[in-house]
């Protein structure tokens, strides 16, 4: 049998509750917790819940595929690493494009070769 752990996104369930209460409820149900953004949350309060946090967004601004904003991804990833350490998170998610309220800030319908190369250089 393979050991695995199920995690629930605290951003997607029990949305009528404050984030701390969502985390408590998920933890009480026996699941690990995921969060998206961390900059708008009380990290010390989240850590004090005793929940196990498994992943979170690993940057705050910028697009991996945009040469004008890709440096923002790297700069804010450094901040995200420090935040992740507070929660014991070992996995950070990077998306090709910045998210605002869970949606792409600058939606693009098709990736070009130049976009792929920019993402490669950024990473």
Where are these regions (language model features)?
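Acidic (Asp/Glu)-rich catalytic clusters
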Residues: 1-3, 21-28, 40-58, 78-88, ...
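Short, Lys/Arg-rich amphipathic segments at extreme N-termini
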Residues: 4-22
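Hydrophobic faces of well-ordered beta-strands that scaffold small-molecule active sites
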Residues: 4-10, 31-35, 53-58, 92-94
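A short, structure-level motif marking secondary-structure boundaries and short turns
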Residues: 6-8, 27-29, 64-66, 108-111
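Acidic-and-aromatic substrate-binding clefts and catalytic sites of carbohydrate-active enzymes
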Residues: 13-18, 32-45, 62-71, 100-103
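Active-site acidic/histidine proton-transfer and metal-coordination neighborhood
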Residues: 66-123
């Amino acid at each position: 049998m393979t050991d695995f752990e199920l995690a629930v996104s605290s951003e997607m369930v029990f949305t009528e509750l404050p984030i701390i209460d969502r985390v408590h409820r998920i933890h009480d149900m026996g699941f690990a917790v995921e969060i998206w953004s961390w900059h708008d949350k009380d990290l010390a309060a989240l850590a004090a819940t005793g929940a196990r946090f498994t992943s979170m967004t690993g940057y705050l601004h910028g697009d991996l595929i945009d040469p004008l904003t890709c440096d923002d991804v790297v700069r804010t990833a450094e901040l995200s690493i420090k935040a992740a350490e507070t929660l014991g998170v070992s996995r950070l998610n990077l998306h090709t494009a910045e998210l605002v309220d869970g949606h792409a800030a600058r939606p693009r319908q098709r990736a070009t070769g130049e976009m792929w190369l920019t993402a490669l250089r950024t990473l």
